[in-house]
Regions:
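Short, solvent-exposed loop/turn elements at beta->coil junctions and helix N-caps
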Residues: 23-30, 130-134
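Charged phosphate-binding loop/patch that engages nucleotide di/tri-phosphates or the phosphate backbone
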Residues: 84-111
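Acidic, metal-coordinating catalytic segment for phosphate/diphosphate chemistry
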Residues: 110-150
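Unchanged
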Residues: 2-19, 26-82, 104-111, 167, ...
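Short, ordered coil/turn segments that flank beta-strands lining enzyme active or ligand-binding pockets
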Residues: 97, 119-120, 154
Length: 182
């Protein structure tokens, strides 16, 4: 894949890569009978001058702005993994044949997917991976259970959990003891 990387970058941009890193292998299952395998690289060193590209217009985009572009939901997963400096990974993305993500697996283990909701609670039709949904602040269904017990002082104690430092949202804050995604 390295020869392809160097050739395609030069042909489509005019740049010769001087520093790159093999990040992962992505398997795309379209749902239309087509499966593609993509070797995923990042590059942070290059020389040369940009050239016009007949396959589309090249444009430098701030990494934070990528999340606001019209990209596939699965692409957001590997952008997140690269942003989090995930070691070399294998990511399998399965679509329903109509561009809707129906399953994702990281290194052979299923990833949690959510139906994204409108403010009224109805489904948008978008399915998003847990880490991406939390990063983007996407509305999704959860169930929260308050566990209580009677006491003699105020009537009730509530069981709380101090969220660990590794939680992806509100680390160190107190929360209910039992909650989960629907």
């Amino acid at each position: 894949p390295e020869e392809c990387l160097l050739r395609e970058v030069w042909e489509e941009t005019g740049y010769t890569l001087t520093s790159y890193r093999y990040r992962g292998l992505v398997t795309f299952v379209s749902g239309n009978g087509v499966t593609e395998y993509m070797s995923l690289f990042t590059a942070d060193g290059f020389v040369g001058e940009p050239i016009p590209c007949d396959e589309g217009e090249l444009e430098w985009v701030d990494i934070e702005d990528v999340w606001n572009l019209n990209i596939w939901e699965g692409d957001k997963i590997f952008f997140r993994l690269m942003d989090e400096e995930e070691e070399f990974f294998s990511l399998k993305l399965v679509y329903d044949g109509h561009d809707k993500l129906v399953s994702a697996a990281l290194n052979g283990k299923p990833m949690e997917l959510f139906d994204i909701l409108n403010p009224d609670g109805s489904k948008t039709g978008i399915v998003r991976e847990r880490g991406v949904a939390h990063r983007e602040g996407s509305l999704h269904a959860t169930a929260h259970i308050w566990v209580v017990r009677k006491n003699h002082k105020s009537g009730y104690d509530v069981l709380l959990q101090k969220r660990s430092a590794c939680k992806d949202s509100n680390p160190g804050c107190y929360d209910i003891s039992s909650a989960g995604h629907v």
